[in-house]
Structure formats: C-alpha cells, structure tokens
C-alpha cells in the first residue's frame, strides 16, 4: 500500500432520525448540492439517497434516509427497510434530532445505537429556534442515552457548527481507499432526480393526504443537444385525487409542471421540456410489484 493510501480515509456516513428533524437539509448542506428534496411536511424522503464528498485524502459517502416511523402500509415498510440497511452498513451513524423533540419515542433505534460498534455522531439540529438552556438540557439528556456518542448542537439551515461536524466525520472515517471515482457525487441518475423534483412540488402545492398518495415515474427521458425531453406520470390512488392534482382547467398541474421545469433546468444546467400526466393506481402503496418498479426494496 502506498503512503497516500495509508493516509486516505473513506466510509459510509448514514444519516438517520425522526421525520422532519432536518436530515435532508443537513445532507444537502454537507454535500453542497440539493440531492434530497426538502419540504415542511414529514415523510418527504422515501428513498435512500447517497451524496459523495471528495478531498485529496478522504471520501465521505453520505446517505440520507427516510424518517423513522411505525409502518402502516408496504411503502412505509420499504422506507424503514432503507433505514435498517443504513444502520447495518454504516461506518459512522449521523443521528439527527432537533430541539423540538425528545428522542424517547425511538426506544428501539436508540437501543440499536447503544449497541452499535461504529462511531455515532449525534446532531441536535435547529438550535437557532431554541434557548441556550433548552439546548443544554437536551445535550445532557442525550449524553445519558448515548454516552459514547459525539454530540453537536447545530443549525443546518443557518450552517452553524457544520465545520466541526465535518471535522469529526473525517477524523472518524476508517483508513480505506475511495469507494467511488472521485468525480462521482451521487449514486442516483438524472431520471431519479427528475422524479424527485416533481414529487417535491407536489408536496409543496397540495395538502392533507394527497402528497402521500402520489408517486412519480419518469416514462421518457431524452437528452438532445439543447434540451432534455421528459415525460412524467403522477400516480394517485383515487379519481378525486386526480382531479385535485389537475385542478380547475388544469391550472394546478400546470403550476407544478412550471415549478418542476424551472428547478430541473437549474439542476441539470440545460433547458427542459416537461410533460406531466396523471393516472390512478389504487394499490400502488401496497403492491410489491409496483413498489419495485418505483425503486423500493423488499
């Protein structure tokens, strides 16, 4: 092994925690790219998404995961499978909580972290909306739950204390060669990001159960010299939801399409021609066949 390889560190840093604590915002900020969609609604993230940060002597493979929940249907069970896999193959666990919650509702996962062999870095996010006393109380509570964890108060939104978190990650990476080529920044392809961008706009523009009843599939993705031609199907579970997604005279769907196209053009750095369609599939959240088609695992 060369001297360079002896010094090189690389590993998988898997981000887990409850819904809506800022896991996706944290990963996007650490990676420097918007790879995970972000909304104010819980359970926005459904897949495990990797973001890779490279330096001369390190490679960090971040992995954003769905928020921990008790599954009510097969889609959510698949989401929790992503979380369990992430715990099992981590070199470092980045457990994210915030100043709004206490983690005692996650007894099962806290017990797993107490027994795990790899380093655990615990991030108490959103300290910008809390008092110093509240943050200190939470830090002490978490020290009792996870005595071996490295604990950081932070604000992913305000980028507070992220440099120290980054340094702790690099210091705790195993000595290893890079897992991916140094010019790779994610494991997902452009079709995946196109579908996620559309899904984000659905979460931002509709309320109640509608966003949770939708899935987006890219049926066509053609790269031309000047633009991408993309056709996406939004699957819903009921005819009434289809009507809500389309809206009066198609205006709601048009708004989603415009917002998605603008973000795709910024992300892909190329013009986009986007077509959206809406179809009804009552069983997609429970059908193993459909879930596999949409990229979920069993």
Q: What is each of the regions a protein language model found here?
A:
Residues 1-81, 85-87:
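Conserved G1/Walker A P-loop phosphate-binding module
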Residues 22, 161, 252:
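Conserved glycine(s) of the Walker
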Residues 33, 52-56, 86, 90-93, ...:
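Conserved, well-folded catalytic cores of nucleic-acid-processing
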Residues 45, 68-70, 102-103, 130-131, ...:
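Catalytic P-loop NTPase motifs of RecA-like helicase/translocase cores
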Residues 57, 81-149, 222-224:
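Conserved C-terminal guanine-recognition region of P-loop GTPase G domains, centered on the G4
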Residues 64, 125, 155:
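Active-site glycine-centered loops adjacent to acidic/histidine catalytic or metal-binding residues
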Residues 119, 128-186:
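Canonical P-loop GTPase G-domain recognition
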Residues 190-298:
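P-loop NTP-binding site
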């Amino acid at each position: 092994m060369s001297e360079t390889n002896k010094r090189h560190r690389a590993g998988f840093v898997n981000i887990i925690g409850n819904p809506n604590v800022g896991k996706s915002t944290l990963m996007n900020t650490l990676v420097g790219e918007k790879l995970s969609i972000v909304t104010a609604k819980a359970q926005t993230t459904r897949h495990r998404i990797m973001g890779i940060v490279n330096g001369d002597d390190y490679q960090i493979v971040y992995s954003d995961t769905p928020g921990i929940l008790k599954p009510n249907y097969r889609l959510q069970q698949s989401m929790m499978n992503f979380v369990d896999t992430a715990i099992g193959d981590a070199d470092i666990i980045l457990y994210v909580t915030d100043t709004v919650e206490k983690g005692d509702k996650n007894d099962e996962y806290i017990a797993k972290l107490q027994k795990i062999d790899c380093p655990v870095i615990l991030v108490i996010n959103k300290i910008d909306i809390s008092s110093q006393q509240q943050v200190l109380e939470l830090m002490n509570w978490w020290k009792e739950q996870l005595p071996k964890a490295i604990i950081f108060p932070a604000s992913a939104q305000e980028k507070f204390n992220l440099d120290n978190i980054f340094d702790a990650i690099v210091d705790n990476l195993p000595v290893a060669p890079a897992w991916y080529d140094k010019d790779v920044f994610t494991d997902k392809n452009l079709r995946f990001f196109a579908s996620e961008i559309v899904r984000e706009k659905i979460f931002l523009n509709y309320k109640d159960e509608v966003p949770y009843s939708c899935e987006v599939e890219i049926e066509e993705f053609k790269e031309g010299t000047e633009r991408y031609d993309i056709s996406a199907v939004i699957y819903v579970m009921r005819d009434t939801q289809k009507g809500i997604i389309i809206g009066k005279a198609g205006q709601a769907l048009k708004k989603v399409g415009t917002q998605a196209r603008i973000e795709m053009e910024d992300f892909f750095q190329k013009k986009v021609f986007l077509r959206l369609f809406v179809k009804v599939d009552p069983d997609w959240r429970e059908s193993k066949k459909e879930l596999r088609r949409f990229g979920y695992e069993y």
